[in-house]
Amino acid sequence: VLIIAVLFLTACQLTTAETYSRGRQKHRARRSTDKNSKWTRECTRSGGACYSHNQCCDDFCSTATSTCV
């Protein structure tokens, strides 16, 4: 009975906190689905122009030719 009461009170607190904070949060936490995520980011394929390694799909930018290798 005590376990059920604790679970019920916890659920009530979570529901209240979610309802109260809805619409008030200015800066939400970043999630793995953001565009800045390496798994979902757009990248330049081999032969395309680049200025840094993180622009290329294979993470290598030739500084001599400014192209992804």
Curated annotation (Swiss-Prot):
Keyword Chaperone included in the entry's annotation: no
Q: InterPro entries recorded for this chain?
A: Conotoxin
Q: Which UniProt keywords apply?
A: Disulfide bond, Knottin, Secreted, Signal, Toxin
Which cysteines are disulphide-bonded?
43-57, 50-61, 56-68
The record's tissue-specificity note reads: Expressed by the venom duct.
Q: Which GO terms describe its cellular component?
A: extracellular region
**Pfam family name, one:** Conotoxin
Domain of life, per UniProt, equals Eukaryota
**TM stretches of this protein:** none
Q: Which molecular-function annotations from GO does this UniProt entry contain?
A: ion channel inhibitor activity; toxin activity
Q: What is its main location?
A: secreted
Q: Where in the cell is the protein located?
A: Secreted
Signal peptide residues on this chain, from the entry's feature table? 1-17
Q: Which residue ranges make up the pro-region?
A: 18-41
Q: Which family does it belong to?
A: Belongs to the conotoxin O1 superfamily.
User: Record's domain comment?
Assistant: The presence of a 'disulfide through disulfide knot' structurally defines this protein as a knottin. The cysteine framework is VI/VII (C-C-CC-C-C).
Q: What else is known?
A: This precursor corresponds to allele E1c. Has not been merged with other alleles since they may differ due to geographic variation (see strains in PubMed:19606224).
| Identification of the protein by name | Conotoxin Eb6.22
Name of the gene encoding the protein in the UniProt record? E1
